[in-house]
């Protein structure tokens, strides 16, 4: 199984565990100094008139096609986005269309993507439609990513910020966003049974300190397990097979002032991306 390249990975895994991120090539004018987006059926690919542009000291460039009337995006917000990522030659390397989804939720500030994403999104507002140039140093850098993203490649992100998500559960220091729930009416997780899940976990300082997808080894947990902090218990209670949820758990519901060894520092907030595989 390929390593994670994008926020799309859990969605692709849910559809087909053996299928990774694909890439699609479209033509570019060889004399152009800017990325050329061809006209297709999707709004992200249509030509648009720029109404504003900013270049930041860190190398990020943002071109606005539409300025939204919603609130400014801040650290910890979860927003629904419609997006595609291209290389300079217009090769598409990422996008929600790969999973046949109209949008994908993105949690700002917790390494769901490269550092450039987290920085750029904090310059946007709900309703913005933009193209963002993410320099390689804030993307995949010198390493690139396998045969998908070359070394030292800038990324060009075309994105519509559709809305800010409201938590499905908000309790104390825990905010849970239910991304998907199957109609399957199976056993629900509680104090007496066992839950099997795929899990990604990050803090602002430690990207994916837990990643069960990497070696395809799901986690099995019981209610009273030491790893199960209060935020996980609140969010996983009554969850069932097929549920996909995002969590942002503040220190008081996570590991508090003690942290969790070298994984979670004192008073750190934790982001989780969880796919429930089975409840037994």
Go through each PLM region and give its residues.
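Cross-family detector of peptidyl-prolyl cis-trans isomerase
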Residues: 15-280
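Sec-dependent N-terminal signal peptides
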Residues: 4-13
């Amino acid at each position: 199984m390929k390593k994670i390249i994008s926020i799309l990975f859990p969605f692709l895994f849910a559809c087909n565990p053996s299928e990774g991120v694909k890439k699609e090539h479209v033509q570019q004018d060889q004399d152009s100094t800017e990325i050329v987006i061809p006209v297709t059926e999707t709004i992200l690919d249509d030509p648009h008139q720029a109404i504003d542009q900013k270049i930041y000291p860190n190398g990020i460039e943002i071109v606005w096609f539409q300025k939204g009337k919603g609130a400014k995006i801040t650290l910890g917000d979860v927003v629904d986005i419609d997006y595609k990522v291209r290389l300079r030659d217009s090769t598409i390397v990422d996008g929600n269309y790969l999973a046949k989804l109209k949008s994908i939720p993105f949690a700002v500030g917790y390494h769901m993507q490269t550092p450039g994403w987290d920085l750029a999104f904090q310059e946007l507002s709900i309703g913005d439609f933009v193209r963002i140039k993410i320099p390689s140093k804030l993307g995949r850098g010198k390493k690139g990513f396998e045969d998908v993203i070359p070394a030292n490649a800038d990324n060009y992100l075309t994105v519509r910020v559709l809305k800010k998500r409201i938590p499905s559960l908000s309790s104390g220091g825990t905010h849970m966003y239910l991304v998907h729930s199957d109609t399957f009416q199976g056993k629900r997780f509680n104090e007496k049974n066992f839950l099997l899940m795929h899990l990604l976990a990050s803090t602002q300082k430690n990207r994916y300190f837990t990643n069960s997808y990497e070696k395809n080894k799901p986690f099995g947990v019981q209610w009273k397990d030491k790893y199960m902090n209060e935020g996980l218990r609140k969010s996983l209670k009554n969850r069932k097979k097929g549920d996909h949820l995002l969590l942002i758990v503040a220190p008081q519901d996570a590991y508090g002032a003690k942290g969790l060894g070298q994984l979670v520092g004192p008073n750190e907030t934790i982001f989780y991306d969880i796919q429930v595989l089975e409840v037994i």
